[in-house]
Structure formats: C-alpha cells, structure tokens
Amino acid sequence: MGFDIHLIANFGALALITLAGPAVIFILFYRRGAL
C-alpha cells in the first residue's frame, strides 16, 4: 500500500514538473513582453 502511494506521488511530481516547466518559461517570456 505504501509502495503504491509512493509510486503515485512520484508520478504526480513528474507530471507536475513536466507541466510546470513550459508554464514557467511561458510566464517568463510573457512578463518580458516577448509574446
């Protein structure tokens, strides 16, 4: 049971990083007025 929770937590963190990476880059460019 603990292993499943740990696996889900790792998958969630990986998905969060995958989604947050492009989002952070987009926000940085947006605040600079590049878009």
Swiss-Prot record:
<dbReference type="InterPro" id="IPR010284">
    <property type="entry name" value="PSII_Ycf12_core-subunit"/>
</dbReference>
<comment type="similarity">
    <text>Belongs to the Psb30/Ycf12 family.</text>
</comment>
<dbReference type="GO" id="GO:0015979">
    <property type="term" value="P:photosynthesis"/>
</dbReference>
<keyword id="KW-0604">Photosystem II</keyword>
<comment type="subunit">
    <text>PSII is composed of 1 copy each of membrane proteins PsbA, PsbB, PsbC, PsbD, PsbE, PsbF, PsbH, PsbI, PsbJ, PsbK, PsbL, PsbM, PsbT, PsbX, PsbY, PsbZ, Psb30/Ycf12, peripheral proteins PsbO, CyanoQ (PsbQ), PsbU, PsbV and a large number of cofactors. It forms dimeric complexes.</text>
</comment>
<keyword id="KW-0793">Thylakoid</keyword>
<dbReference type="GO" id="GO:0031676">
    <property type="term" value="C:plasma membrane-derived thylakoid membrane"/>
</dbReference>
<keyword id="KW-0602">Photosynthesis</keyword>
<feature type="transmembrane region" description="Helical">
    <location>
        <begin position="7"/>
        <end position="27"/>
    </location>
</feature>
<keyword id="KW-1133">Transmembrane helix</keyword>
<dbReference type="GO" id="GO:0009523">
    <property type="term" value="C:photosystem II"/>
</dbReference>
<protein>
    <recommendedName>
        <fullName>Photosystem II reaction center protein Psb30</fullName>
    </recommendedName>
</protein>
<dbReference type="Pfam" id="PF05969">
    <property type="entry name" value="PSII_Ycf12"/>
</dbReference>
<comment type="function">
    <text>A core subunit of photosystem II (PSII), probably helps stabilize the reaction center.</text>
</comment>
<keyword id="KW-0472">Membrane</keyword>
<keyword id="KW-0812">Transmembrane</keyword>
